[in-house]
């Protein structure tokens, strides 16, 4: 949890926080008020925080949401830190949080998506984190290509995406929705993802972890509006989504942009 012990009027502070719902990423604690977000993002962070050193590196978080991971990255001493997310609400959440958790104003927040990286950030970063974005892209290869070109030579990508459990080079393409999400297009096997990444130009593809999403990590709280994981799974068989697909399984990966291609 990210904690700020500065003192504020608790009633006014809570009103501001609740006006910014839903809180997807967190948790945070400000002046003893806990923002109990839908996702316990510390679980994912613990899986990727030591994937590669961030000290004195130029680092990006593509799909940064409200900045939870950016604030955690600050603790590792990067040279600079840029977050990318086109969402309007999550930027407002970041602007609310930044005075508490980025008091030196080191983070740059860009309202851009992965497809916009080439406009300003070609060959710009030593490390890019892209967590929970790829399966939302209609063209995952184009997204990977954009990430590749945004990295410096010998730069590293830390990637998290939904995957399917299969030894084959295949991807699930949901018919209409996946776990009630309309914007999920391709969920690859690890082998298929490795092929995509290598086709774009990445090398040294490494599996950091594979983990099922559980209610410990994603659940309904007073700080979101609407449903969460428990509502997206088959009521009689939690190994399946409501649509009959396998329940969410996430893979965490690291790869390198090589010196030559």
From Swiss-Prot:
Cite the Pfam families for this sequence: Methyltransf_9
Q: Which reaction(s) does the protein catalyse, per the Swiss-Prot or TrEMBL entry?
A: carboxy-S-adenosyl-L-methionine + 5-hydroxyuridine(34) in tRNA = 5-carboxymethoxyuridine(34) in tRNA + S-adenosyl-L-homocysteine + H(+)
EC main group: transferase
What are its E.C. numbers?
Answer: 2.5.1.-
The protein's GO terms of the molecular function aspect are: transferase activity, transferring alkyl or aryl (other than methyl) groups
Q: Which UniProt keywords apply?
A: Transferase, tRNA processing
Note whether tRNA processing occurs among the keywords: yes
- Which terms does the UniProt entry file under GO BP? tRNA wobble uridine modification
Glycosyltransferase as a keyword?
no
Q: Which cysteines are joined by disulfide bonds?
A: none
- Where along the chain is carboxy-S-adenosyl-L-methionine bound? 25, 39, 44, 63, 114-115, 135, 250
- Assembly: Homotetramer.
Regarding protein family, the annotation reads: Belongs to the class I-like SAM-binding methyltransferase superfamily. CmoB family.
Quote the protein name from its UniProt record: tRNA U34 carboxymethyltransferase
Q: Which organism is it from?
A: Helicobacter pylori (strain G27)
Q: Which gene encodes it?
A: cmoB
């Amino acid at each position: 949890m990210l904690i700020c012990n500065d003192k504020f009027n608790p009633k006014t502070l809570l009103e501001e926080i609740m006006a910014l719902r839903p809180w997807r990423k967190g948790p945070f604690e400000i002046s003893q008020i806990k923002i109990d977000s839908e996702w316990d993002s510390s679980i994912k962070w613990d899986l990727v925080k030591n994937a590669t050193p961030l000290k004195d590196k130029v680092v990006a978080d593509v799909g940064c949401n409200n900045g939870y991971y950016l604030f955690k990255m600050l603790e590792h001493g990067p040279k600079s830190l840029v977050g990318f997310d086109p969402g309007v609400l999550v930027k407002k959440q970041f602007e609310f949080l930044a005075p508490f958790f980025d008091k030196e104003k080191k983070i740059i927040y860009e309202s851009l998506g992965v497809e916009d990286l080439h406009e300003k950030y070609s060959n710009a970063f030593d490390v890019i984190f892209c967590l929970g974005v790829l399966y939302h892209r209609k063209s995952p290869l184009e997204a990977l290509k954009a990430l590749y070109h945004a990295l410096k030579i010998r730069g590293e990508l830390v990637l998290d995406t939904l995957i399917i459990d299969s030894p084959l080079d295949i991807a699930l393409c949901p018919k209409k929705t996946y776990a009630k999400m309309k914007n999920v297009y391709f969920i690859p096997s690890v082998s298929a993802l490795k092929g995509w990444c290598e086709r774009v130009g990445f090398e040294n593809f490494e599996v950091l972890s594979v983990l099922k999403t559980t209610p410990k990590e994603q659940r309904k709280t007073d700080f979101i509006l609407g449903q969460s994981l428990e509502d997206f799974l088959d009521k009689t068989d939690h190994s399946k989504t409501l649509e009959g697909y396998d329940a969410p399984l996430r893979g965490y990966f690291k790869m390198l942009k090589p010196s030559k291609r």
